[in-house]
Structures are given as structure tokens and as C-alpha cells.
């Protein structure tokens, strides 16, 4: 089966690609600095391939996953940015083909003979709560399949939570980070696919759904190319620590505030205060105190 890389301009002339990418091809192509928006076209999977996968793994594939594979046997879309005449690969959106939708096992995670087993790394102290579902297990309680290797930054997984034989309604999508901690993403594959597309495949975007968030470098890219339906709360506090922002209106306002006290200084000659030097001295010290105080809230 042949796979064909589509050049940027082909997205608009191929309706099935436009439908598959939910129209973000045109959004990316119109973004400043974005270049080489490429989709690797894959033929649809045949129904017998899905049936064979289900029989081999003793799992019923969810209906939305089936429909996806009947449209395209996997998905891979990339885009780059041009900075100072250098082209840097940036965005990557991928879903494994059926043949690569393989189960995560001990051998697939570790190859060293004396490495700890996945059972040794189980953390049962953080089980299901009101706001967080029960985490997947590496033993027979869960069946885990890799949807995307995330370019080495983790693994997005289709998780059957009831073991084998596994039913389609028992699936969820989880992110396994490099430290082998689990993070819930979505209840369904369709919901995850929307997240993947709307986050534009930005580096480490899955970490936005973890307690420790995305890295400082990833925040820079998120600020330049904001995801389409991004939760701004994830960026509001921490982004200011890493991205320098210059607001001209605020700069000029602060200058005006410095000028105004100097004009008012001589108008208040009243009692008990030290002459004209009084207003300028305290105001500068208070200004320095406030500025030093405001420079400390950022923490690493």
C-alpha cells in the first residue's frame, strides 16, 4: 500500500483531506512563518484488517476508532517554521496505523535484563477520585495500545480498563509521560482527535493536561502559535515568567506617573515635612520597593 506526501497546496483541492484535518491546513498556511505543511496520505484500512486486529488482541475496537481507520489507515501531518532563513520542523500530528496499534507490554517498555518491571512501578496511592478516573494498570487489569509515540516525549494510549476480553465501551485515552506517570486526556477517541488537531500538533502539547504543564521552550511556541480552542488559564500565570512582553501603553503610563509627583511636590508645603526634597526621596524609595516586590513572584 502506497503512502503519498501531499504538498501544502493540495489540502484545498482534496476535500477528504480537508475533512480529515478539520480545515486547519488553511489556518496553518496563513499563519506567519509557517511553511511546509504536509500530510502523508494513507489509504483506508479494509474491514478484514480491523476484524483481524480484534481477534488477535481479544478486544472490540470502539466505533469511532473503526470509522477513523476506514477513512485512513493512520494519520501523519507535519509543519515547519522559517526563522532567519532556517526551516525548523515544529508541529507533528500522528495516529498509528492498525499494524502499529500494538499493545504496550513489559518487553516494549524495557529491554535491559535487570530493569524494574512495570508492576514494580505501579503507584496505587493515586487511585480514582471524584475529579479523576482510575489510572490504567500495566498488569492484566488493563489492556493498553499505543496511538502515538509523541516523538519520544511520551505515549498517547488507547486504554481498555477492564482487561480481556475487552469491550469497546470500556476505553479511554490516556497520556503516559516519560516518567511512566498516567494522565487522563479524553473519554473517547473522537474527543482526543479534536484535541490533537486544535492543538496544531505543537511540541509537548499533551503536557498541558498534566499537573506540571508544558516546558518553558514549548510555552514560547504556544505563545506564537496559539492552539485554536486553547484553555488560556494554562498560560496566564506562567507564560509571563518566560515570555518577555512590552506594552507601549503601560510604559508610557508609568512615565506619566513619575512626572506627576514632581509637579505636585512644591504645591504641598505643609507642616512637619522636610522641604522640597521630601517628596522625591520617599517616592523613589517606595517605587523601588514596589518594583523589587513585584519581581519575586515567579518561581521555577
Curated annotation (Swiss-Prot):
Keywords noted in UniProt: Cytoplasm, Cytoskeleton, Microtubule
UniProt superkingdom: Eukaryota
Main localization category: cytoplasm
Region listing for Disordered, in residue ranges: 257-300
Compositional bias ranges of the Low complexity kind: 276-300
Localisation per UniProt entry: Cytoplasm, Cytoskeleton; Cytoplasm, Cytoskeleton, Microtubule organizing center, Centrosome, Centriolar satellite
SUPFAM superfamilies in UniProt: SMI1/KNR4-like
Record keyword Transferase present: no
Any one annotated GO CC term: cytoplasm
Record bears the keyword Acetylation: no
Subunit structure: Part of the neuronal tubulin polyglutamylase complex which contains TPGS1, TPGS2, TTLL1, LRRC49 and NICN1. Interacts with CSTPP1 and LRRC49.
Its biological purpose: Subunit of the tubulin polyglutamylase complex (TPGC). The complex mediates cilia and flagella polyglutamylation which is essential for their biogenesis and motility.
Protein name per the record: Tubulin polyglutamylase complex subunit 2
Organism expressing this protein natively: Homo sapiens (Human)
Amino acid at each position: 500500500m502506497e503512502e503519498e506526501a501531499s504538498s501544502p497546496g493540495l489540502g484545498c483541492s482534496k476535500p477528504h483531506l480537508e475533512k480529515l484535518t478539520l480545515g486547519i491546513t488553511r489556518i496553518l498556511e496563513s499563519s506567519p512563518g509557517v511553511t511546509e505543511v504536509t500530510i502523508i496520505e494513507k489509504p483506508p484500512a479494509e474491514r478484514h484488517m480491523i476484524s483481524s486486529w480484534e481477534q488477535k488482541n481479544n478486544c472490540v475496537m470502539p466505533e469511532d476508532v473503526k470509522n477513523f481507520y476506514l477513512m485512513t489507515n493512520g494519520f501523519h501531518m507535519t509543519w515547519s517554521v522559517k526563522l532567519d532563513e532556517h526551516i525548523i520542523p515544529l508541529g507533528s500530528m500522528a495516529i498509528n496505523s492498525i499494524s502499529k496499534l500494538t499493545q504496550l507490554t513489559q518487553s516494549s517498555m524495557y529491554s535491559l535484563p535487570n530493569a524494574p518491571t512495570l508492576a514494580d512501578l505501579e503507584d496505587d496511592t493515586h487511585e480514582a477520585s471524584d475529579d479523576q478516573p482510575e489510572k490504567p494498570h500495566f498488569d492484566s487489569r488493563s489492556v493498553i495500545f499505543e496511538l502515538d509515540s509523541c516523538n519520544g516525549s511520551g505515549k498517547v494510549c488507547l486504554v481498555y480498563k477492564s482487561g480481556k476480553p475487552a469491550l469497546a465501551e470500556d476505553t479511554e485515552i490516556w497520556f503516559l509521560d516519560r516518567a511512566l506517570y498516567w494522565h487522563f486526556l479524553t473519554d473517547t477517541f473522537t474527543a482526543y482527535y479534536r484535541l490533537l488537531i486544535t492543538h496544531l500538533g505543537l511540541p509537548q502539547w499533551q503536557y498541558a493536561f498534566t499537573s506540571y504543564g508544558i516546558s518553558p521552550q514549548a510555552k514560547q511556541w504556544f505563545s506564537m502559535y496559539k492552539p485554536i480552542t486553547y484553555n488560556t488559564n494554562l498560560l496566564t500565570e506562567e507564560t509571563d515568567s518566560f515570555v518577555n512582553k512590552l506594552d507601549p501603553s503601560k510604559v508610557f503610563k508609568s512615565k506619566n506617573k513619575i512626572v506627576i509627583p514632581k509637579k505636585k511636590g512644591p504645591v504641598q508645603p505643609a507642616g512637619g515635612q522636610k522641604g522640597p526634597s521630601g517628596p522625591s526621596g520617599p517616592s523613589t524609595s517606595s517605587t523601588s520597593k514596589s518594583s523589587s516586590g513585584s519581581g519575586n513572584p515567579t518561581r521555577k
